[in-house]
């Protein structure tokens, strides 16, 4: 029998190579293998060093440990307009291959509904990975203030410190004034960290409304230990077990329409500290990211570091966020309009 000719061997080799290419290509594009050796970008819609930033940077370090291929991740702070810059960037111009994700303050998922004119995204079309935890906001006065209860805040003007006009510290006292009849006088423009702290401690202001309870415990634990604060009301869909004697704002609203407005606004608090990928990420890679998020939320090392930093972790998965948003966007137009008027006065409905 004659040996195959060189030309015939070349043809056979070409056929074998061609047959192998689809399998090799499929392997290279497998979602689990895509992230190997890649650098991810993590857009953080908050300033460096603040409460949101500490949460998100801690989370980001552990997230990549649960993504096959162990990619690296580079945080990029984009605090402008209370996180709108980060959300707009993620939605309009970020890579849609799964290598860019974003994390935001709690206003971002609802700003589309409330008609924020600066929002160039549809929150329902972002690919949510989950939320690190809800916001457990409270209103509190300093120990020297004569206002010790929410009832007293309905009788007498209370000067409260606030950051930007779009911050919780500015929005929540305005909401309570409208729906509960409180008399908070909002003094805005303070730095959300040290500025508001100094204003309270110096007596320049009497209190703050929309304060994150978990962030405050992490940043100012001595305030609790030394009983420096009078916590007068809770701002959430559910109450904090550790503050059993502090009433919930929802429990104080008797008018059913006002209650529905407040419930809609407080969905922002429930969503809390959300993380998302842009629209258009391939389904397999999105599943990898969502699985990595869920695994991070159960990672003992992550939870231990969070506890050390006094960061409370109460995660929501992607489905929970999608459900909250679907319910919010299904609200009656009249309720949305009233809520929007308190959250975003320039909204055009």
Feature map (PLM): residue ranges:
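Bacterial N-terminal signal peptides that target proteins for export
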Residues: 1-13
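A short beta-strand structural signal in non-transmembrane regions
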Residues: 272-278
């Amino acid at each position: 029998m004659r040996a195959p000719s060189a030309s015939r061997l070349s043809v056979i080799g070409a056929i074998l190579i061609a047959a192998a290419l689809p399998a090799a290509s499929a392997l290279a594009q497998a979602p689990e293998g895509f992230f190997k050796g890649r650098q991810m970008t993590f857009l953080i819609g908050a300033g460096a060093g603040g409460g949101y930033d500490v949460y998100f940077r801690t989370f980001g370090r552990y997230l990549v440990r649960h993504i096959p291929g162990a990619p690296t991740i580079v945080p990029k702070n984009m605090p402008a307009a209370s996180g709108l810059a980060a959300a707009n960037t993620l939605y309009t111009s970020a890579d849609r291959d799964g290598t860019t994700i974003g994390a935001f303050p709690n206003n971002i998922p609802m700003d589309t509904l409330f008609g924020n004119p600066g929002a160039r995204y549809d929150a329902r079309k972002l690919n949510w990975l989950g939320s690190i935890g809800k916001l457990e906001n409270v209103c509190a006065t300093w120990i020297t203030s004569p206002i010790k209860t929410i009832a007293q805040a309905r009788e007498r003007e209370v000067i409260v410190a606030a950051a930007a006009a779009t911050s919780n510290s500015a929005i929540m006292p305005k909401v309570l004034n409208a729906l509960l009849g409180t008399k908070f006088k909002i003094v805005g423009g303070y730095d959300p960290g040290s500025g508001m702290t100094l204003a309270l401690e110096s007596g320049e202001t009497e209190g703050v409304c929309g304060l994150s309870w978990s962030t405050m415990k992490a940043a100012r634990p001595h305030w609790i230990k030394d009983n420096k604060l009078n916590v007068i009301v809770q701002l959430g869909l559910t109450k904090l077990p550790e503050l059993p004697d502090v009433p919930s704002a929802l429990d104080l609203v008797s008018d059913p329409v006002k209650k529905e407005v407040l419930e809609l606004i407080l969905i922002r608090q429930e969503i809390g500290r959300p993380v998302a990928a842009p629209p258009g990420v391939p389904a397999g890679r999105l599943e990898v990211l969502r699985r990595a998020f869920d695994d991070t939320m159960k990672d003992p090392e992550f939870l231990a570091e969070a506890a050390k930093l006094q960061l409370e972790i109460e995660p929501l998965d992607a489905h929970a966020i999608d459900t909250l948003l679907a319910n919010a966007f299904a609200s009656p137009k009249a309720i949305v309009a009233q809520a929007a008027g308190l959250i975003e006065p320039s909204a055009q409905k």
